[in-house]
Amino acid sequence: MEFVLKALEGIFSIVFIIGIGFVLSRRGWFDEYSSALIARLVTAVSLPLYMIVSISKNFDHNKLVAMAPDLLLPICSMLLAFGVGTIAAHVFKIKKERRGIFCTNFFIANTMFIGLPVNLALFGEKSIPAVMLYYMVNTTFFWTLGVHNIVQDTLSDTKNKSVFFSPAALKKIFSPPLAGFIVGIVLVLLDCRLPPFLMNSFQYIGNLTTPLSLVFIGIEMSKIPLGEIGFDKDLLLGVAGRFLVCPVCVLALVPFLPVTPLSAQVFTMQATMPAMTQMAIVAKNYGADSAYAATLSFLTVLLGIVVVPLYMMLVNMYI
């Protein structure tokens, strides 16, 4: 039961920080400009530096090359979950301004702030390489395919909406966080190390990413009258996609793809994590339905109190 308690600690920390943003916003600390500033600060400054630091510190050239075969499972499972989400969005007639968020939520998870401590509690430090591998694929897909989905909801030009690499979409997709991620990968592949003072500075600023993202979710939640938070099909299906479809896609592909037993266990746990906190930030930045994104993120965190420990016990017993 100790590993379950450790997982709950991570979830309670998230709820607490979201609560701070919620309470301060209700007390008038933040206006529309403040929340936009937080979104911009995270997207343009702290998150790109966080990407560079996290990749540079957790990978080296040899480790990245050696673990390359294990990349196949997270890549295929996320693409499968994305396909299921896209079909579900059309079959169940998800609102147009929510479809990108809805589909992204199906295959993108909070793999670091919750995922890392959960896997450390369950499998120990030997799980860190697999955790970071899933994180790398998760991050790549979020800042390309995920952002593309969210951007599509904001484009009025029908021609632009039909082309992945349209000028309007590409300008938004090639964001500072994606640039930071690419820089981190290049540094690892070239076996380059930044000077310690620079890495320390990047880490200090990068550490702002998670708390600011969670405070932002609290701010967005405070703008929604509690009585108006309806559990409509868009929300319920989004939750089902996050906690059911994504992990099932991983489990369905395990017998058919080359992967170590430990990586299979870690990837399954990573797929069960709540929604990515930066999803609400991106929705705000690009003019999508940020209230829906914030509500979906917050709800998956709350439900994670029950769902994540349940999956931990199942994985520990059967996989």
What is each model feature region?
Residues 1-319:
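Alpha-helical transmembrane segments of multi-pass small-molecule/ion transporters
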